[in-house]
Amino acid sequence: VKADELLLASIAVPNPKWEKLRRKHLKEHNRCAACDTRRNLEAHHIRPTQWYKELTLDPSNLITLCTKPANHHLFLGHLMDFKSWNPDVVEDAKVWREKIKNRPIWRRF
């Protein structure tokens, strides 16, 4: 089975328990872990459910990432390729959040 087939299968089959957990997670964690936006959020599995099926409904396996405008879901969660995954997504999101929070702001004098 190819990686893209696994991804398609995991997306194509709706799971009522997953949808309930997803909604609860996004209600409790309503900001992107990387940029703090409240818009276009996704509950991302830290460990992919294709290989860690037992973690599909585990709340500790979720992190909130945005899909727009920065798309940290693709950038940090999947390293720019939805066939990939980032085992360091939690740590990477913290690093990016600090970088964004502490970035220098250009000011006109």
Feature-to-residue mapping (PLM):
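Short Cys/His-centered divalent metal-binding micro-motifs
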Residues: N40, L62-D92
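Intrinsic-disorder/low-complexity peptide segments enriched for small residues
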Residues: D4-L6, S60-I63
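Short linker/helix segments within small regulatory modules
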Residues: R47-L62
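Polar helix-capping/helix-linker motif
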Residues: S10, P14-N15, D58, K68-P69
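Short cysteine-rich loop/turn motifs with clustered Cys
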Residues: P16-H44, C66-K68
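Intrinsic structural disorder/low-complexity segments
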Residues: L26-E28, R47-P48, F75-L76, D81
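A boundary/linker detector
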Residues: V1-L21, D36-N40, K83-F109
